[in-house]
């Protein structure tokens, strides 16, 4: 639908972004990015599937046939969501959270779940 700030004069940017995400997911607007012919890890079935992946405002909004402002052909490339390490003892790693992130991000771990006291212990007093 192409919502803009002039649409009502008072719609804030966050709402416009959310409306854009909805419209892209519904196929009414072009995605910001479409990864064409991408093979992705289906974390529910454990299988590799191949489809187009639509991205709007930095979020994956759909799989299937989408048009994009930017399109990248991905035959033979595998796309995988960020991994979540659901049980980590950060304190036992003997490194700061920033150093830990530098070590795990290149391997696909984007999220960790740890006890708050461990974060406090490794952050120090600074």
Residue ranges of predicted features:
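Histidine-rich, glycine-flanked metal-binding segment
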Residues: 7-34, 39-81
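Metal-associated gating/positioning segment near the N- to mid-region
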Residues: 66, 74-126
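Conserved glycine-bearing catalytic or ligand-binding loops at nucleotide- and phosphate-handling centers
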Residues: 3
């Amino acid at each position: 639908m192409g919502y803009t700030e002039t649409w009502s004069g008072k719609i804030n940017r966050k709402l416009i972004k959310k409306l854009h995400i909805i419209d892209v997911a519904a196929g009414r607007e072009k995605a910001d990015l479409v990864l064409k012919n991408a093979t992705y890890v289906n974390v529910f079935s454990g299988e590799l599937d191949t489809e187009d992946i639509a991205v709007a405002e930095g979020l994956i909004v759909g799989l299937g046939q989408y048009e994009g402002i930017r399109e990248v052909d991905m035959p033979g490339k595998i796309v995988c969501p960020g991994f979540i390490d659901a049980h980590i003892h950060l304190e036992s790693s003997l490194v700061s959270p920033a150093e830990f992130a530098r070590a795990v991000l290149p391997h696909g771990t984007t999220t960790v779940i740890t006890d708050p006291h461990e974060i406090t212990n490794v952050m120090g007093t600074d």
